[in-house]
Amino acid sequence: QSLDSIDSLKLDVEKKIIENFRERSKTAYERDLADALIEKINPSFAPSMVEYYLKNLIEDVKKQNSGEPLDDEKVRDHYMPVAERNVKWYALRNKLIDHGKLEVSKDDLNAEIERLVEANTSSENEIRKFYKKPSNLKRLEDGLMEKIILEYLEQFAKVKEVEVQTKDLRGKENEY
């Protein structure tokens, strides 16, 4: 009995590790896809949009810092590249939505909520209540739109898949 449970534990852990790597790989791929488009097009942006973004980001950092003193200029300098990248992505994202006539339907939203409920059946009521709030539903819609945009972009991308062994990743992490 205990051998079975050890084997099943090993399989479960291995499955979770593989899924985690897949998810991290997918996230990195999507980020690289967006970054490649930003680099290729290098859209112009209003400096005021970056300032507004940074102002909100600094406020968030202050809230997370629990009132500890914070050097606004250091935070600003640190996050400036992130702010510029995100403002550029936002501009491109809107153009892609218009150009590709991309949209998230009510059916898409309902299907995603159902998927979340099925994955967390014990929290069904909380999930449904959470997405009744317009701001939460909007966040879900934005996430789905991001997926639709990335799927749209994939048709134009030349992707080379490379399989990397875990031991190779460990070796690279130790180089730093």
Model region roles, listed by residue range:
Residues 1-176:
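Extended, charged alpha-helical "arm"/coiled-coil substrate-binding scaffolds
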